[in-house]
Regions:
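Enzyme catalytic cores with a strong preference for nitrogen-chemistry domains
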Residues: 1-417
Length: 417
C-alpha cells in the first residue's frame, strides 16, 4: 500500500463549492471530476488545434458538426445531468440523529502554554452544558468535539486519563448523550527490544507508540476508540519506517511516528434504557482531519455500515489561509459520494452540518467559540461509488500500466529492427 499520497490537489476537488455541478460523483467520485476536467480541456484544445492549422476547414460538414457536438457534449452534459439530480434530490424520510458540534476555539500554538488540560475540559463542557440546557427527551444525542482535544489517553487503561473520567462523570447527568472527541493517545509496550520501527523508548524494557484517535464516550465505562489511519506524512507518520526511521533517528527524531489502524472501524452512538442496557446502535464513520480528503477511505466507512459521517479536525495550524475553507468544502464531496449527512467539528472553525446533497445546512464562523446544533439524517443505502469503489482510478491505473508496457514493447521492437 502506498504510504505517501496527497489527494488534496485532485482536479475534481475544484467543484467542491459548486456541488450542483457534480452530483454524479455518487457514481464516479472525485476522480470522475478530474476526468471531466481533463476531457473538457482536451476537447477544447483539439478544436483549437484544428482551427489553427486549418484542418478544421478541410473537414466535411458532418465531421465539423460531430467534432463540435462532441466537445459541447463533454463540456455540458455532466453539468446538466448534475443540475437535474441536484434539484430532483429528495432527502430520505426516516430516522434522524440530534447532533451538537462543539468549537472550543483553542489556539493550538498556545494550547499547552496558556491553558492546562483541565481548563480546556471546562471550556468544552461549558459549551456542551449550554447546548444540553433544557433537554427533556431521552433520545440519543451526538456531541462532537475536535481532533486532538486532549493528550492524556492511554489505550486499554482509560481510567488513567483525567479527561476521560471528567467527561464520563459529566455525561452521567445526561441520559443517552454520546460525546465524540479527538485525542492524542498512547500504547505502552513492555519489550526487551524495540517492538516496532515506530515505537519510541521510554525506559529500559518499556516502549510507547502514539496514535491520533477518536473516542466515543457516554456516562458508562463502555468507551470506544478509533485510530486515524490516513496520517499526514512527516508531521504524523514516518513513511516506510524500516528505512526512514533509521534516518529520522540520526536527525534526532523530528518526524511523527503515529501508528494508525490497518482497516477502518466504526463507532456507535448508543441509546440505553433506564438500566443502562444498549437498545439501539447508530453506526458512524469518524474521519479524523486529513482522512476526510480521501474519497475511497470515507466510502469504506459506509461499506462497513455507517449511517452517517462525522469529521473531527483542527485546522487552526494553517491560520487564516484558504486551507481551512478548502478542507470544509471537500466534506461536501464526501457527502455526495456516499449520500451521507455529515457533522463536522473543527477546533477554531469552520464547524458545519452538511446534508447528503453536499449543501452546508449550517456552519460556524472562523476563529471564535461556537456551538452548532441540528439534526442529521441516517441512511443505509449505498451509492454506486460506495458499492463499486473508485472505478475511474482503477481504470486509469490499468491504462497507465498498459501504456507503459506498450511503450516498452515498441522500443524493444525498434531496437530489433
Amino acid at each position: 500500500m502506498a504510504q505517501i499520497s496527497w489527494p488534496w490537489l485532485l482536479l475534481g476537488n475544484a467543484f467542491a463549492r459548486t456541488v450542483s455541478l457534480v452530483q454524479w460523483y455518487e457514481w464516479l467520485g472525485t476522480l470522475g471530476g478530474s476526468l471531466w476536467v481533463w476531457a473538457s480541456n482536451l476537447s477544447v484544445f483539439a478544436l483549437m488545434v484544428f482551427l489553427s492549422d486549418g484542418s478544421w476547414f478541410r473537414f466535411n460538414a458532418k465531421a465539423r458538426f460531430a467534432s463540435a457536438a462532441a466537445a459541447l457534449l463533454i463540456f455540458f452534459a455532466p453539468a446538466i445531468l448534475s443540475m437535474s439530480m441536484y434539484y430532483g434530490h429528495e432527502q430520505q424520510e426516516g430516522d434522524t440523529l440530534k447532533v451538537v458540534a462543539l468549537q472550543p476555539n483553542i489556539d493550538p500554538y498556545h494550547k499547552f502554554q496558556a491553558l492546562s488540560q483541565s481548563q480546556q475540559n471546562v471550556i468544552l463542557l461549558e459549551q456542551l452544558k449550554t447546548a444540553l440546557s433544557g433537554r427533556t427527551d431521552t433520545s440519543a444525542l451526538l456531541a462532537v468535539a475536535p481532533e486532538t482535544f486532549t493528550n492524556d489517553i492511554v489505550t486499554g487503561d482509560y481510567e488513567r486519563s483525567k479527561t476521560y473520567r471528567r467527561f464520563r462523570e459529566f455525561l452521567k447527568q445526561y441520559h443517552n448523550v454520546n460525546l465524540l472527541f479527538g485525542a492524542s493517545s498512547y500504547s505502552y509496550i513492555e519489550s526487551a527490544g524495540a517492538p516496532s520501527y515506530t515505537a519510541r523508548k521510554v525506559s529500559d524494557g518499556l516502549w510507547v507508540e502514539s496514535h491520533n484517535s477518536a473516542l466515543m464516550v457516554d456516562g458508562t465505562d463502555d468507551a470506544q476508540i478509533y485510530h486515524k489511519s490516513k496520517l499526514v506524512v512527516a508531521v504524523e507518520m514516518t513513511p516506510y519506517p524500516a528505512f526512514f526511521c533509521k534516518i529520522d533517528d540520526l536527525l534526532g527524531g523530528v518526524m511523527g511516528r503515529c501508528v494508525g489502524q490497518k482497516e477502518v472501524s466504526l463507532l456507535s452512538c448508543r441509546t440505553r434504557d433506564a438500566e443502562g442496557k444498549v437498545v439501539e446502535d447508530v453506526p458512524l464513520g469518524c474521519a479524523v482531519c486529513y482522512e476526510s480528503v480521501y474519497p475511497e477511505h470515507c466510502a469504506e466507512y459506509v461499506r462497513k455500515g455507517a449511517k452517517a459521517l462525522a469529521i473531527i479536525t483542527n485546522d487552526a495550524w494553517w491560520g487564516n489561509t484558504p486551507g481551512y475553507r478548502q478542507h470544509l468544502s471537500y466534506a461536501s464531496l464526501r457527502a455526495i459520494e456516499t449520500r451521507r449527512d455529515i457533522v463536522r467539528s473543527a477546533n477554531t472553525g469552520i464547524s458545519a452540518i452538511i446534508d447528503s446533497r453536499g449543501d452546508i445546512v449550517s456552519k460556524t464562523a472562523w476563529w471564535e467559540p461556537a456551538v452548532l446544533e441540528g439534526e442529521i439524517h441516517l441512511s443505509e443505502k449505498q451509492t454506486f461509488f460506495v458499492a463499486q469503489g473508485d472505478i475511474v482510478g482503477r481504470l486509469c491505473a490499468f491504462m497507465a500500466v498498459m501504456l507503459l508496457l506498450f511503450c516498452i514493447v515498441r522500443k524493444l521492437s525498434f531496437r530489433q529492427e
